[in-house]
Every structure is written in C-alpha cells, then in structure tokens.
Curated annotation (Swiss-Prot):
UniProt KW keywords: Disulfide bond, Hydrolase, Protease, Secreted, Serine protease
Domain Peptidase S1: residue ranges: 1-163
Subcellular compartments: Secreted, Extracellular space
Molecular function terms from GO: serine-type endopeptidase activity
Organism: Lucilia cuprina
GO biological-process terms attached to the record: proteolysis
Active site: 26, 119
Full protein name: Trypsin alpha-3
Catalyses which reaction(s): Preferential cleavage: Arg-|-Xaa, Lys-|-Xaa
Predominant localisation class: secreted
Disulfide pattern: 89-106, 115-139
SMART domains: Tryp_SPc
Enzyme Commission number(s): 3.4.21.4
Length: 165
C-alpha cells in the first residue's frame, strides 16, 4: 500500500503467436513512459538462457489472491515453489498431459501456487527470470502445478520485442 512507484505504460507488444485457447506463447513486453531508478526495492533481473533443472528452487510473486475466489492482498506476496520440468509436468504424475507445450514451464509445491491476479508476474530461479505467470487449474490444487511462460524458450522473442516496442 505504500512505498511503491507508479509508472504508466507507453507501449506494449503481445507475442504474435499467442493462443488464448492453448495459452501458447503467453508473454508480452511493455515499455514504460519513464525510466525507473534502481533502489533497494527496484532491481533489474537477467533473462534465463536455459530452463532450470527439475526440482530447482524458485520464487513467484504478485498481487493476486491467496486462494481461488479470495480477495486481493494489500501487500505484494511471494511463495517458494519447485520447478517441475516440462516432460514431468506433462506426464501422468500431474493432471495436464498434452496441454503443456514447448513455450511453458511448471512449478509446484503442495499447498503453494500463484493465483488469480498474479498473471504476468515473475517466476525467479537462480537469480534469473525463468517464467511469467500464465495459467493453472485453480490455485494450489493437488497434482496441478502452476504453469508459466518459459522465458528461456521465448527469450529471443522477448529481446527482439524489447528492442522494437
């Protein structure tokens, strides 16, 4: 509720291959109307060049609800999760199967997840942006990891779009 910086968006670019039915390429780039000054609460982050290993520690943050149908929090929240590799996420261990595509990465820890309102937020692992909150079945549903746009897989598009938006 306090201490933040409000900056308007000057322009944005959605991935041309985004599909709202399959959620493939669920990523966009924004250009702010003014520059941000780095500080103790505003920092830059590098883009992942490779997907983190299955089981790697990660953190997702956002302003979303803390449960399905819940209310929006007054403070930025975060939760620690573990990376679930694409092959494992699409396996029979979890409930998604073929819905998991090459432009997606998953993260799961029992009882912890991103939720409504977190979409577009960061998934960070190893000090790099590895994912962008995309979709999932409910929030923290058993055997349904959170699904994220895979930054490493989409990195070349992000870099190109950032230079042209």
């Amino acid at each position: 509720n306090s201490g933040g910086v409000l900056v308007s968006v000057a322009a944005f670019k959605n991935h041309e291959g985004y599909n709202s039915k399959t959620m493939v390429n669920d990523i966009a780039v924004i250009r702010l109307s003014s520059s941000l000054t780095t500080s103790s609460t505003i920092k830059t982050i590098g883009l992942a060049t490779a997907a983190p290993a299955n089981g790697a520690a990660a953190t997702v943050s956002g302003w979303g609800t803390t449960s399905s149908g819940g209310s929006i929090p007054s403070q930025l929240r975060y939760v620690d999760v573990k990376i679930v590799g694409r092959t494992q996420c699409a396996s029979s261990t979890y409930g998604y199967g073929s819905e998991i595509k090459a432009s997606m990465i998953c993260a799961y820890t029992v009882g912890k997840d991103s939720c409504q309102g977190d979409s577009g937020g960061p998934l960070v692992s190893g000090g790099r942006l590895v994912g962008v909150v995309s979709w999932g079945y409910g929030c923290a549903a058993v055997n349904y990891p959170g699904v994220y746009a895979d930054v490493a897989a989409l990195r070349s598009w992000v870099v190109s779009a950032a230079n042209s938006v």
